[in-house]
């Protein structure tokens, strides 16, 4: 008598093999301080990629284009030319 060894292979993938389910962690870019807000020196004002907003008075630009305050003062977001923006920090007048 002839014996046949038949094997059936699955035609569907098993459960749990989703190709979705990955996403990069958010970089938390954008404004960190509001217009008119008091900041101390070294405070981060704006996190960005590239120069969406330019540094103005008393504001420095880090290696990753982060804008930070160089002095204690009040934040001011301003227009710079036709289609540019800048952020400046102005010292607060001391009361006598």
Curated annotation (Swiss-Prot):
<protein>
    <recommendedName>
        <fullName>Large ribosomal subunit protein bL27</fullName>
    </recommendedName>
</protein>
<feature type="compositionally biased region" description="Basic and acidic residues">
    <location>
        <begin position="20"/>
        <end position="35"/>
    </location>
</feature>
<comment type="similarity">
    <text>Belongs to the bacterial ribosomal protein bL27 family.</text>
</comment>
<dbReference type="InterPro" id="IPR001684">
    <property type="entry name" value="Ribosomal_bL27"/>
</dbReference>
<feature type="compositionally biased region" description="Polar residues">
    <location>
        <begin position="8"/>
        <end position="19"/>
    </location>
</feature>
<dbReference type="InterPro" id="IPR018261">
    <property type="entry name" value="Ribosomal_bL27_CS"/>
</dbReference>
<keyword id="KW-0689">Ribosomal protein</keyword>
<keyword id="KW-0687">Ribonucleoprotein</keyword>
<dbReference type="GO" id="GO:0006412">
    <property type="term" value="P:translation"/>
</dbReference>
<feature type="region of interest" description="Disordered">
    <location>
        <begin position="1"/>
        <end position="36"/>
    </location>
</feature>
<feature type="propeptide">
    <location>
        <begin position="1"/>
        <end position="9"/>
    </location>
</feature>
<dbReference type="Pfam" id="PF01016">
    <property type="entry name" value="Ribosomal_L27"/>
</dbReference>
<dbReference type="GO" id="GO:0022625">
    <property type="term" value="C:cytosolic large ribosomal subunit"/>
</dbReference>
<dbReference type="GO" id="GO:0003735">
    <property type="term" value="F:structural constituent of ribosome"/>
</dbReference>
């Amino acid at each position: 008598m002839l014996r046949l060894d038949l094997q059936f292979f699955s035609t569907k993938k098993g459960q749990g093999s989703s190709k979705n389910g990955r996403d990069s962690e958010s970089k938390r870019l954008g404004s960190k301080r509001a217009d008119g807000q008091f900041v101390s020196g070294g405070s981060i004002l704006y996190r960005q990629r590239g120069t969406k907003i330019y540094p103005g008075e008393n504001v420095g630009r880090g290696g990753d284009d982060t804008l930070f305050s160089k002095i204690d003062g009040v934040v001011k977001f301003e227009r710079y030319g036709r289609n540019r923006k800048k952020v400046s920090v102005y010292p607060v007048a001391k009361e006598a």
